[in-house]
């Protein structure tokens, strides 16, 4: 069994990573192969809703100048998927959102690629007050 975990935090080993790591450590104890992918420090364009993935039916986004297609392939090959993100301004991080929009569009356009996978999410938040 293989699980891929995506860290949507810009901080490589911040709180989101620590939460994901707690889960993946337990999975590894059970003999499950685990890979953590750091998404949050990348530049990812959002989905353009061009329908190219639906037309091509190749399990890829037509935008190929970033790591998203590699990550989609990892999700397709995995038995389980963990998504981790900090909360920024009441939502998941922008990079993670862009990645997920594209991955889910590709997945739903290619026969529901992730339909029978085990999934989990980890959201981290802080109570730091800031004035804007």
Model-derived features with residue positions:
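Short, glycine-/small-residue-rich phosphate/pyrophosphate-handling segment
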Residues: 94-95, 108-132
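N-terminal beta1-alpha1-beta2 submodule of the flavodoxin-like/Rossmannoid cofactor-binding fold
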Residues: 1-109
